[in-house]
């Protein structure tokens, strides 16, 4: 007779809590997000920017066909991490809810309303049998009266952030945000900070591996940076990183000189 671990029942059943109060399947969904491509968002007073890692696994893939920032409405976009097929289902649902709201009320859906609806759907998939949690987290960003940036968790929880990252590079990117983000950051600074945080999580950052989009309060319409614009920002950032590394090495040598 095969040995069955004590936690096996809680491990397989989505609706059953373990004795220490956990839903194992929700934890596993979070693990899928932690292994996913990194996505970051940065907010400034006049708008918000999203930047996402594009994992091009073959040189035969057309990079332009690999979309990682999804437009929900004119004023709202989402960047996923985790199981992208799950994320597409959430994106399609968000687009539907945005259309229903616009047809019903004759105005764009507030981002907070849309985030709550998506998180209600996520939460329902942790409570009923016959389904599993969505193995995807979304960064949802947009503007109504002000710029907003939310992280949605597989459990259905959501949080508003000034700057945030999800995916495998979360810890590295969040450390950079903690060090460099300020409330008076401008659009140029926010875009550069988002690309910097993403570049630090990549072994070989390139314009093909980074997708960037932003929205401003003035225009209230998402715009994606083309490859040339991403390359310009990335080259500036990589130059700054090299200069910092040179300065650090010079400091190390000056400390050695003092010991002689």
Curated annotation (Swiss-Prot):
Disulfide bonds: none
Regulation: The formation of the proteasomal ATPase PAN-20S proteasome complex, via the docking of the C-termini of PAN into the intersubunit pockets in the alpha-rings, triggers opening of the gate for substrate entry. Interconversion between the open-gate and close-gate conformations leads to a dynamic regulation of the 20S proteasome proteolysis activity.
Subcellular location: Cytoplasm
Highest taxon in the source lineage: Archaea
Family annotation (SUPFAM superfamilies): N-terminal nucleophile aminohydrolases (Ntn hydrolases)
Keywords tagged on the record: Cytoplasm, Proteasome
Entries under InterPro entries matching the protein: Ntn_hydrolases_N (IPR029055), Proteasome_alpha (IPR050115), Proteasome_alpha-type (IPR023332), Proteasome_asu_arc (IPR019982), Proteasome_asu_N (IPR000426), Proteasome_sua/b (IPR001353)
BP term (GO), one: proteasomal protein catabolic process
Entries under PROSITE patterns matching the protein: PROTEASOME_ALPHA_1 (PS00388), PROTEASOME_ALPHA_2 (PS51475)
Record-linked SMART domains: Proteasome_A_N
One GO location term (cellular component): proteasome core complex, alpha-subunit complex
GO molecular function, one term: threonine-type endopeptidase activity
Ribosomal protein recorded as keyword: no
NCBIfam families, per database record: arc_protsome_A (TIGR03633), PRK03996.1 (NF003075)
Annotated function: Component of the proteasome core, a large protease complex with broad specificity involved in protein degradation.
PANTHER family: PROTEASOME SUBUNIT ALPHA/BETA (PTHR11599)
Subunit structure: The 20S proteasome core is composed of 14 alpha and 14 beta subunits that assemble into four stacked heptameric rings, resulting in a barrel-shaped structure. The two inner rings, each composed of seven catalytic beta subunits, are sandwiched by two outer rings, each composed of seven alpha subunits. The catalytic chamber with the active sites is on the inside of the barrel. Has a gated structure, the ends of the cylinder being occluded by the N-termini of the alpha-subunits. Is capped at one or both ends by the proteasome regulatory ATPase, PAN.
Similarity section: Belongs to the peptidase T1A family.
Protein name: Proteasome subunit alpha
Organism expressing this protein natively: Thermococcus gammatolerans (strain DSM 15229 / JCM 11827 / EJ3)
The gene coding this protein: psmA
């Amino acid at each position: 007779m095969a040995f069955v671990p004590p936690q096996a029942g809680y491990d397989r059943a989505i609706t059953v809590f373990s004795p220490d109060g956990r839903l194992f399947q929700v934890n596993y969904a979070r693990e899928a997000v932690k292994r996913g491509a990194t996505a970051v968002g940065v907010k400034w007073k006049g708008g918000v920017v999203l930047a996402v890692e594009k994992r091009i696994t073959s040189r035969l893939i057309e990079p332009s066909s690999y979309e990682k920032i999804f437009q929900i409405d004119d004023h709202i976009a989402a960047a996923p991490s985790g199981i992208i097929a799950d994320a597409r289902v959430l994106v399609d649902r968000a687009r539907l809810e945005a259309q229903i709201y616009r047809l019903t009320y004759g105005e764009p859906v507030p981002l907070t309303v849309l985030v709550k609806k998506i998180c209600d759907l996520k939460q329902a998939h942790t409570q009923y049998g016959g389904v599993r949690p969505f193995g995807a987290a979304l960064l949802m960003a947009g503007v109504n009266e002000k710029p907003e940036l939310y992280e949605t968790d597989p459990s259905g929880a959501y949080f508003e952030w000034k700057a945030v990252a999800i995916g495998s590079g979360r810890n590295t990117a969040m450390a950079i945000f903690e060090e460099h983000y300020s409330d008076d950051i401008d659009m140029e600074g926010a875009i550069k900070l988002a690309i910097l945080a993403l570049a630090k999580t990549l072994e070989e950052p390139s314009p093909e591996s980074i997708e960037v989009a932003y929205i401003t309060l003035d225009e209230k319409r998402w715009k994606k940076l083309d490859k040339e614009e991403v390359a310009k920002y990335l080259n500036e950032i990589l130059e700054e990183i090299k200069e910092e590394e040179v300065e650090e090495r010079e400091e190390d040598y000056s400390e050695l000189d003092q010991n002689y």
